Structures are given as C-alpha cells and as structure tokens.
C-alpha cells in the first residue's frame, strides 16, 4: 500500500484500507446470478419478464425478449449509462428498474457489445426477486461471507467501521477531495457503492481461478458456472480496453493464440479507479485500487510487470497510427451520441478531431475535451486523452445507405450516429 486515504487528513493507506471497487462489482453480481442459475431460480436464456413481469424499456420488443444473458454479456443495446438516483430505501433497486421504461436503445438487441451499467442493475433486481432478499444481503450472504471477506461493504454504514479511502479529482499535483463521496446507492449492482481492500478482490480472483472454491476451502460457485463466466460471448469491436466479454467477465487474449487466458474487470467511481486481472494457468492475480491521479498509467505498467514476470505473458500493445493511410472522412464525420453525451467528429486544421461533450448529469464525471484522431486501420483511429500517454481507440462501424458509419465504438461503448 502507498499514498493516503484522504489528502485533507493525511491518513496513510494500508493493505486493509477499503476503496470503492466500481464495476469490478459486476463480477460479483454475475457470480450471484450464476449461483441462482445453478439452483434453477434463474435462467440465462429465459425472458427477464419471467422474473420481473412488469419490466419495460422504451422498446416494446426488447422489453419482451431481453434475457439475463443479454444483461451479463452487455449485448442488450440498452442505453446503459443511466444513473438516476432512486433513493436509499431497501426498494431502491426495484425503483431504479422501474425508471428504465423510457430508456432507449443504442443498438438492436444482441447486435453487438456495448457496455451497459443499467443491465447489471436489472440483473441485481432479478437476484433480489429470485433469492427473496435485497441485493446487498445476497452479496454478503452468498459471496462475502463464504469467501471470508467480512470487510467487503455495500453500504457506507458498513464501510465506516473500517478505514476508507475517499476519491480525489483534478490533475496530479492539484488534487482535491471529490465533492460527491458516493454514486447513487440504487446502482450498486453495477458498481456504484461497494468497497473492498485489494486482498478481498484477490480472494475473489483466487476463487475463480480454483474453479469456484475459495482459499478457505468453501465452494462458492460450481465449476461449470466459473467456466461459463470465462467463455467468450461476444467480441469487443475496439480491441484495446478488452478483447471479449463473457458473463460479467472481461476476457483478453494476450498471446494471440485465439484463446482467452486472462480475465478480470476494471472499475471507476468519482475519483477512484480499480483494476483486476487474473491468469488461471499460472495462478497469477493482480488487483490495483486507487483514489486519484493517473491510475490508468500505473495500472498499465503494473499489469505488464506482474504478468510478464510471474506468468510469462505480456499485454498486447494498443494499435498505433499508420502513416499515409487513406481515410474516408465522409464516412466518419458527424455526431454520435448516447445518454451520457455526444461525440462530434469534426475536421480542424486538416485533422480529424473527436469532441466529447458530456450530458448535464455527467459533467461531474468528465469534462468536455477534444482528441485528435490518427488512422490505425480500416475504420479504426487512435487518440490520446489530455494528461495521458496511452492511446484510446475509436472504431467506426457499419455503414448506412450513404456510406457513413452507423456507430462509433470507443471506451467499450457504442455511440449511434445522430447527424
């Protein structure tokens, strides 16, 4: 452990400090769902409405046909960055799911991978109904307790019994404590609230690498469920952040043999970020929890060092610009959008530039910014965010009748063309 829990108090971080783990929570929600699939209380391929009869999104056909599998592998097409606060009562997840009735599709059901936070809250509600309890109680009873990780917390009043880290925002050298300590509790199954120490996350990874058996010898998941979570369901078009998705799990093929051998997830909340990678073949796992600064750069370096040294495999380098590559600018120019904001691809001083503008509800998470794009392949571009060195990929997909891209895929999300 290094650094401090809070720059205003100067309290040092320790191996026992709890950090917000963000979307690493999705691994836990998927594991809960798979436990209930194993007992027959949930079905991966049955309509969500079999469990939640009144479930609805804006698209009536999707409301009827959506399955748990679509939710866990991010192929629902639901515009998933929907962070409305449904309160703090024990019915908060249920209330949140009701709010989805007006949420539209980014793409048709099952059409492609596009990261969907809302889908995991729906899965959390299915867990509640199937298990007859709240998601918070289910995760403590079914995962935290058998794993032997009692400090794993899903509510602030649980976490305050331990040492906690607070998030920090701003640039390195000018960081300040985040004005918002937590995201909405109603989004907890997607990762808004849970807190854990790095050891807790590694314990979960060890369970997954051991076919569902925790380090303390307790069987947490059937081996078949772990295997299912590690199987490719869908590939990610912009292969930089991840290569493919399983059931709640991200997959990587670092050695290029066509098989996925590294698993895990990333997470972020306001001012905190987390990374988990594990390689069952070598029994190597790495967790990094941060509460400010350029955590992404540290994570990239640490992942490379740990897995090159301990597992003998090295992460694939991101795509690089290709000099002289012909670009069909008419294909990519235009506005792309989803609930979280818009990306305008414009021409400026002879260059293509992606101008990111967050929606009003997302301004606290990310400021407007522009990224110069350089061609790296057919429909593939790379650019570097301000303050970072590792490039981001922009993948322009499919074509409409005018030969213009229908979708822009970046940050593991699809944005549909708006203009």
How should these model regions be labeled?
Residues 2-7, 59-270, 274-275:
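Short, surface-exposed loop or secondary-structure junction motifs
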Residues 4-7, 293-295, 413:
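A short acidic/small-residue loop/turn micro-motif
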Residues 8-71, 106-118, 189-192, 283:
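Short active-site loop at a secondary-structure junction
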Residues 33, 204-208, 306:
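Hydrophobic "lid"/C-terminal helical patch
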Residues 249, 284-285, 309:
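Solvent-exposed loop/linker segments at secondary-structure transitions
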């Amino acid at each position: 452990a290094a650094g401090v829990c809070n720059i205003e108090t100067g309290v040092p971080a320790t191996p026992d400090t709890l950090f917000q783990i963000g979307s690493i929570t999705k691994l836990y929600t998927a594991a809960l769902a798979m436990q209930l699939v194993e007992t027959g209380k949930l079905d991966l391929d049955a309509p969500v409405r079999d469990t939640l009869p009144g479930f609805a999104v804006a698209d009536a056909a999707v409301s009827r046909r959506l399955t748990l599998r679509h939710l866990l592998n991010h192929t629902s097409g639901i515009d998933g960055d929907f962070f409305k606060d449904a309160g703090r009562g024990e019915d908060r997840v249920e209330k949140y799911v009701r709010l989805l009735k007006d949420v539209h599709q980014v793409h048709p059901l099952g059409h492609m991978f596009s990261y969907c936070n809302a889908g995991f809250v729906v899965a959390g509600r299915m867990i509640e109904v199937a298990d007859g309890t709240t998601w918070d109680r289910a995760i403590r009873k079914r995962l935290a307790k058998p794993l032997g990780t009692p400090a794993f917390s899903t509510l602030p009043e649980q976490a305050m019994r331990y040492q906690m880290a607070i998030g920090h925002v701003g640039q390195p050298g000018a960081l300040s404590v985040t004005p918002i300590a937590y995201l909405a509790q109603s989004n907890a199954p997607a990762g808004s609230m849970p807190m854990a120490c790095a050891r807790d996350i590694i314990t979960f990874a060890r369970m997954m690498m051991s076919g569902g058996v925790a380090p303390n010898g307790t069987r947490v998941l059937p081996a078949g469920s772990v295997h299912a979570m590690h199987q490719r369901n869908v590939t990610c078009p912009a292969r930089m952040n991840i290569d493919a998705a399983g059931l709640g799990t991200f997959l990587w093929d670092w050695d290029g043999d066509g098989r996925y051998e590294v698993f895990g997830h990333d997470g972020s909340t306001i001012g905190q970020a987390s990374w988990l990678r594990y390689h069952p073949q070598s029994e190597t796992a790495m967790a990094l929890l941060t509460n400010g600064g350029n955590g992404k750069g540290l994570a990239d370096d640490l992942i490379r060092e740990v897995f090159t040294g301990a597992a003998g495999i090295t992460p694939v380098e991101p795509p690089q610009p290709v000099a002289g590559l012909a670009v069909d600018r008419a294909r990519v120019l235009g506005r792309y959008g989803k609930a979280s904001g818009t990306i305008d691809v414009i021409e400026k001083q002879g260059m293509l530039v992606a101008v990111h503008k967050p929606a009003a509800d997302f301004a606290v998470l990310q400021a407007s910014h522009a990224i110069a794009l350089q061609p790296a392949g057919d429909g593939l571009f790379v650019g570097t965010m301000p303050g970072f060195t590792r490039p981001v990929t922009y993948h322009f997909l499919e074509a409409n009748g005018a030969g213009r891209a229908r979708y822009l895929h970046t940050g593991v999300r699809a944005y549909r063309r708006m203009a």
